[in-house]
Each structure stands twice: as structure tokens, then as C-alpha cells.
Amino acid sequence: MFYIIESDHQLEWLKNQSNEGGYIDIISSNDNYHPLLTQTICVYIRPTNSDQGFIIPISHDEGLNVDKERVYELLKTFTPLYTLDKKNLLYHFNLQSAIDLSLVYSMNKFDRLQIPDGNSTINWYYNSYGDKTDLNRLIPIAKLHERCEKVYDSIKQYISLPIPSGFDFYNNLATNVFFLIEQSGLGIYYEPFVEMFKPRNPLFNTIDNRVLTSYNLYNATSRPTNSFNSINFAAIPHTQEHRRAFKPQNDYFVEFDFDGYHLRLLCTQIGHELLDESAHKQLAKLYFGKEEITDEEYTQAKQINFQAIYGKIPEEHKNLEIFVKIQDYIDQMWKMYKEEGWVANPQSGKEFTTELSDMNPAKLMNYMMQ
């Protein structure tokens, strides 16, 4: 049976297989490059009711390529449509209803979905020509299809996992927000940037004097992290030397800091009202019993607050009303977790279940605040 879709007849046949949904994988021009810098080479589609997947070439040297817009119209007929990484998919097709299978897995299993390596042919091409921008255009379609089939066979069992509580928040809102943020990147002075950060290959994620990153939503807590090509925006040193590698837009760097973000979230959940002034300063007044707070006392108050947020309430302050409320909140949350087997984050709706290992009240509080 054919597996390469190249003719109108084959496209129509494949469309008739879409009524039960399917799984899609994008073959970009080079897996090493940031998705913003790639083109769509092929699409792998595996109808749910089929015992094999199909490759649709869009800009491959070996195939009778199909117009990308026609492929897009075809893909919209598959419902439900699963994919390994929805955010990556959006760089190629605006399929907002797609279901991120890696996200389904991570929210059910509190771990990252592991994907098998490619075949020996693909590995040889990447070891030999990994910097070539359109590398996947040169790899035989049969080998690309073989890799996609291998990946699908390893993950198909997880399509039956239940859609977890809070999934829509991450699959739709969070995915789209970080998809947009990623495309902005950070302005750089190219040579100082390369000298200081030493990326494996700067071409993998730089364009127009901007460096790009990729956000990961597949952590156990679902707190986003970012990294691409050895660059982590959250770990850039705050030194003047390192700042010289970055170029501000419109001549200015603007720094924002949400005052007591996690503390304010917690106070909202326990019903403790905070005023508009600094949250840390308000609580410092309680700790030290006075209105005027020194810089040293403010720093001490921040340390106390961070400890309390993650369930470590100082003994000398545990009788203050706010800490009584926090302790009650922790106790009730832990009781529900032990008795019901789960608790849900009030912001996102994500559930944390007893599948999490080595859980304790302080760790559970940490997960809830992330």
C-alpha cells in the first residue's frame, strides 16, 4: 500500500479517513534549528483507524510536492488531532484545536514523554551535515516515514490517557502565549554574544541580531522553563559584562518586578487582604511591630515570607493571624490530597495526584505555588 500522498485522488482518500481523528508530526527543514527559522518539508499523518501513517511532501526534493494550503485544509478535517508538540506545530499550521500529547502525558504522569532516537540513516545525515539549513529535504522520504512510524508506535498508547483537569489552560492559553513570546527573542550584539555564551552553533537560533529560545510546559509543576541551543533566558547573569551582549529595543532595557507575586497569590487563596503597597513591607510591619522598616528588616521579612509560601512557617511567628491561615490552608490541602488522592491548583485547575513521588505538605505547597 502507498504511504506517500502526492495526488488529488490520494488526498481525497486520506480526507475520508479523517472522521475518527488522527496524529500529526511535522518534518521541518532541520531539527537543530529553532522552529521560527525552519520551513515545512513534509507532514506525517496517522489516521486513528489506520494501521500505518502517511507522508505528505510539501517541499522535499524527492516527492511530487503538495501545496501547503491544501494540506492545511486537509488537516483541519481530522478531529481530534493529536500532536507531539502543539507549540512547534503552530509554527507550521495554525491548528488551534490540536491536542498536545506531550502535555497530556506530563499532566497525567508528572514526567516528560520520552521519544526514541531516529534511525541510523537519519543519524548519519545529522552527524555529517547537521548545520545544513534544509537537511531534512535531502533525507530519503522512506527514512523520514520510518522515523515517524517509530515515534508513533512508542507513544500511541498514551492517546487513550484522559484529558486532565486544567488541560485547556495549558494546551490553549499558555501554549499560545509562549508561542508569541518565543518569536520576539532578545536583541543581541552578535560577536559579544557568541563570545560570552558560546552557543553550539549561533545560526541555530539567531536571526536579525536576535536570539530565540523555546519554552517548555512539560514540567511536573507546569512552571515554564526555557532553553534552546545552550541559551536559557532565565539564567543570564546580571553582570554589566554580560548585559553588553544584549541590544535593547528603542535604546532602553525595561525591568519589571511583580511585588510579592507568589505571596499575593497565597494571600488571595487564604482570604488575607493586602494593600497596594509592598506586600513584603506590610508583613514586615507585623513581624517587627512598627511602621518604619529598615532595609535589613525588609530583607529579613522577604526571607520569612518565602519560607512561609513553601510551608516553612517560622516558629516565632506561627501565631500571627496570617500564618495561622497559611497553616490551616496547608493542613486542609494535605488532608484532601491524602483522602481524595488529588488537589487542584486554583489558578490553572491542574490536579496534583498521589502519583507524585516523595510528596509531603511543604513540597505539595511548593507545587501549588509554581
Q: For each predicted feature, which ranges?
A:
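RNase H-like, metal-dependent ribonuclease domains
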Residues: 12-14
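Acidic, glycine-rich two-metal-ion catalytic cores of nucleic acid-processing enzymes
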Residues: 2-4, 18-19, 29-41, 45-50, ...
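Non-catalytic nucleic-acid-binding/docking modules located in mid-to-C-terminal regions
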Residues: 98, 172-173, 188-193
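Conserved DEDDh/DEDDy metal-dependent 3′-5′ exonuclease domain
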Residues: 2-8, 18-24, 28-162, 260
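Helical catalytic core of nucleic-acid polymerases
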Residues: 90-165, 174-184, 229-360
